[in-house]
Amino acid sequence: LRGGTRFYVLNTTDVVTARAASMPIGTRATESVVGALWSTWCRLGLPQVFQIDNDLVFWGSRRYPRAMGQVLRLCLMQGVEPLFIPPAEPWRNGIIEKFNDHWQQKLLARTQLNDFDQLVSAAVAFDAKHNSRWRYSKTGGVSPNEALRRSSAELRFPPSEQPPTLPLRRPSEGRYHLVRFIRSDRV
């Protein structure tokens, strides 16, 4: 972006159909991440399992490191099971890392954007193009949208376009998963 505007992008992909949704955000604050995640779920549908990295914003806060964070609460309240990969192991998120590279090369490197609003519009347009035209071998050479049409998946969507108001209450049910690395010498 012109002027050196700092931004982050929450990229989400469906591992079965390869559909993707990107949502640029100005900060990594919980409110921004919850809003971006909600926006991607409104476009892609609610996943059964949501694999994410162990970034602090997804599971908690520095102030209360053992408390259940707002993103984790949001997932559980919507019936989504978060699956946290180990810290500092991005290769465990290979699908999203590949999409991040694709997004960087095909959108950011080729498009001159003047402000944050243009970035958001360009990201939504990129997602639409990606989902309707890009072909993957894992989808049998068809676009992500066509892979969805051919699947028997029934999509669930959030109950409204607006994300819930924070702070979220602690859910009484649901489960989440933590993947950890165990060395062969068991240390």
Q: What residues fall within each predicted segment?
A:
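C-terminal, beta-rich DNA-binding module of retroviral/retroelements integrases
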Residues: 131-187
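RNase H-like DDE/DDD metal-dependent nuclease/strand-transfer catalytic core used by mobile genetic elements
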Residues: 1-11, 15-124, 128-129
